[in-house]
């Protein structure tokens, strides 16, 4: 060993033939890649020629495999104190019951007075496309004062504020994280903004009338036309200083405040300056978030607290650069980063669609419903799978009878897809089982299905499969033709097994399989395209 000296490195560099990875950090005005890895890291599972095609049952569609992602370990919709626990909380609840009755009376009286004032302000007002006249806005001050009384009745005797709201002409759009139903009440009192809300809110008793006075922009989250119209209205009202400022909750639903989920882009497409606002609910014994807890239960718990803490922080206005004005995604990322940093929480790819999956799993009485969330924003970005399609995939997965941990084993998987054990069906399962543990999760099932579904050759292959099965060319596949077509991929099929597969592929259940039937079924069960693989590799 050489004698040590002060100038020699402690760890000697060893030469390597492997290329170094150069990481370039992009600032806000650079391209959208964020991090550029040069040279690109090559996945050893991709492009392995004939060996890959042999192992991959979908090699005739693509040489790639679905991305490997870890399990979703966080539930952003979980209320951490759904019930009364501990002696302190029980004693406090009993002591506060008389206070709760007084608060309930104050709540009802404030709601009634605010509702009547709003009805008066709206009486005879027909021109809803223009800003509300000033004298009507002055009447709405009665409703705003009533909303402060409502906050008081819920235990928010004082609310800590940090920073100040920017003037409307500086930041016409305000965005905030969304934890409870309390924030809209607070913002109505504090800012009296125009909000963007779901169409379903219009039918709520009392509340629907009040938000109509805010010249609410309604949106149906499942309608692309409705979303486009909402963006147009946001642009129109943000560009006119006579309208109130606009308030949006870009998460699209409430969370527990422990993470920040993906943002919808409606607030960022217009390209106007945005003021982010952060809301916190510091607590020890009572989580005030509106997650997996009913509204009535949450209201009762609020009524029976001595005081509920709430903090509102107005962050500096975000002025979009010229590139960000043209790129809503970058502006959204910059805003969400500012809010997440202030909250000191991580950002996830969950979205409202994950809440739909969670509610669906709860309705189906599945154990641990949070196992079925998949971070749908990433799924939609990678595979363009909609929330409704994801719920249909969940129905298929549930038919495989997952265990308490949300996992499905081979025999249950095969039964759910009407397959029998054979080399091909096992390779299909192994294609999904990226962890190689002998069981699959819903997230893995969805990613594999979405990966196959979005391959450029998928539709063409489905059409070729129909032509191959329709031996007599009459436009329909008979049960005999199906059995003949499958005998090479799934050998030794008996009549009952062929009949089960035929029933699955007959989408409209009219006892014959048309091309539309097959295409529709394979869109809902894209993994089944592998059983039509022989002689279908398009050139």
Curated annotation (Swiss-Prot):
Disruption phenotype: Delayed senescence. The double mutants lpeat1 and lpeat2 exhibit impaired growth, small leaves, short roots, reduced seed setting, reduced lipid content per fresh weight in roots and seeds, and large increases in lysophosphatidylethanolamine (LPE) and lysophosphatidylcholine (LPC) contents in leaves. The chain crosses the membrane at residues 93-113. PROSITE patterns: EF_HAND_1, EF_HAND_2. Ca(2+) 1 binds at residues 470, 472, 474, 476, 481. It is a single-pass membrane protein. One of its GO terms (molecular function) is plasmalogen synthase activity. It is found in: Golgi apparatus membrane; Late endosome membrane. Signal peptide: none annotated. Its main location: Golgi. Keywords: Acyltransferase, Calcium, Endosome, Golgi apparatus, Lipid biosynthesis, Lipid metabolism, Membrane, Metal-binding, Phospholipid biosynthesis, Phospholipid metabolism, Repeat, Transferase, Transmembrane, Transmembrane helix. CDD domains: EFh, LPLAT_LPCAT1-like. The ratio of isoform 2/isoform 1 mRNA is increased about 15-fold in the nonsense mRNA reducing factor mutant upf3-1. This is Lysophospholipid acyltransferase LPEAT2. It comes from Arabidopsis thaliana.
């Amino acid at each position: 060993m050489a004698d040590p000296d002060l100038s020699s490195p402690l760890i000697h560099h060893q030469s390597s033939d492997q290329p170094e990875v150069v990481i370039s950090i992009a600032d806000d005005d650079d391209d959208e890649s964020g991090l550029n890895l040069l040279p690109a890291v090559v996945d050893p599972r991709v492009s392995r020629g004939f060996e890959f095609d042999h192992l991959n049952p979908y090699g005739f569609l693509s040489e790639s495999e679905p991305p490997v992602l870890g399990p979703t370990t966080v539930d952003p919709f979980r209320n951490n104190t759904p019930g009364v626990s501990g002696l302190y909380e029980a004693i406090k609840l009993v002591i506060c019951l008389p206070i709760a009755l007084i608060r309930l009376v104050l709540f009802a009286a404030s709601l009634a007075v605010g509702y009547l004032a709003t009805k008066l302000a709206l009486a005879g007002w027909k021109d809803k496309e223009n800003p509300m006249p000033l004298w009507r806005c002055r009447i709405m001050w009665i409703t705003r004062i009533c909303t402060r009384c409502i906050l008081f009745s819920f235990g928010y005797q004082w609310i800590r504020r940090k920073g100040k709201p920017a003037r409307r002409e500086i930041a016409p759009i305000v965005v905030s994280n969304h934890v409870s139903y309390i924030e809209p009440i607070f913002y109505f009192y504090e800012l009296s903004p125009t909000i963007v809300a779901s169409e379903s809110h219009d039918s709520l008793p009392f509340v629907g009338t009040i938000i109509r006075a805010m010249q609410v922009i309604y949106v149906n989250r499942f309608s692309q036309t409705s979303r486009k119209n909402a963006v147009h209205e946001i642009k129109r009202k943000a560009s006119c200083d006579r309208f109130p400022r606009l308030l949006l909750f870009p998460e699209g639903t409430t969370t527990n405040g422990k993470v920040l989920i993906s943002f919808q882009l409606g607030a960022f497409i217009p390209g106007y300056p945005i003021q982010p606002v952060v809301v916190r609910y510091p607590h020890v014994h009572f989580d005030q978030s509106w997650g997996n807890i009913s509204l009535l239960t949450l209201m009762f718990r609020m009524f029976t607290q001595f005081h509920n803490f709430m903090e509102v922080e107005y962050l500096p206005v975000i002025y979009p650069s010229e590139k960000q004005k043209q790129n809503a995604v970058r502006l959204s990322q910059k805003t969400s980063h500012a809010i997440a940093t202030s909250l000191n929480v991580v950002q996830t790819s969950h979205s409202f669609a994950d809440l739909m999956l969670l509610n669906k799993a709860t309705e189906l009485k599945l154990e641990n419903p949070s196992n079925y969330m998949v971070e749908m924003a990433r799924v939609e970005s990678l595979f363009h799978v909609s929330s409704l399609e994801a719920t249909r995939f969940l129905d298929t997965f549930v038919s495989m009878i997952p265990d308490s941990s949300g996992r499905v084993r081979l025999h249950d998987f095969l039964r759910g897809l009407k397959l029998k054990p054979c080399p091909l069906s096992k390779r299909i399962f192994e294609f999904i089982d990226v962890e190689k543990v002998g069981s699959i999760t819903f997230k893995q099932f969805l990613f594999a299905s979405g990966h196959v579904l979005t391959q450029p050759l998928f539709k063409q292959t489905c059409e070729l499969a129909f032509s191959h099965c329709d031996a007599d060319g009459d436009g329909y596949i008979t049960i005999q033709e199906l059995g003949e077509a499958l005998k090479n991929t799934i050998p030794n099929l008996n009549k009952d097994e062929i009949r089960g597969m035929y029933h699955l592929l007959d989408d409209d259940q009219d006892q014959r399989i048309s091309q539309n039937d097959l295409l529709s079924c394979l869109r809902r069960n894209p993994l089944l395209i592998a059983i039509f693989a022989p002689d279908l590799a398009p050139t």
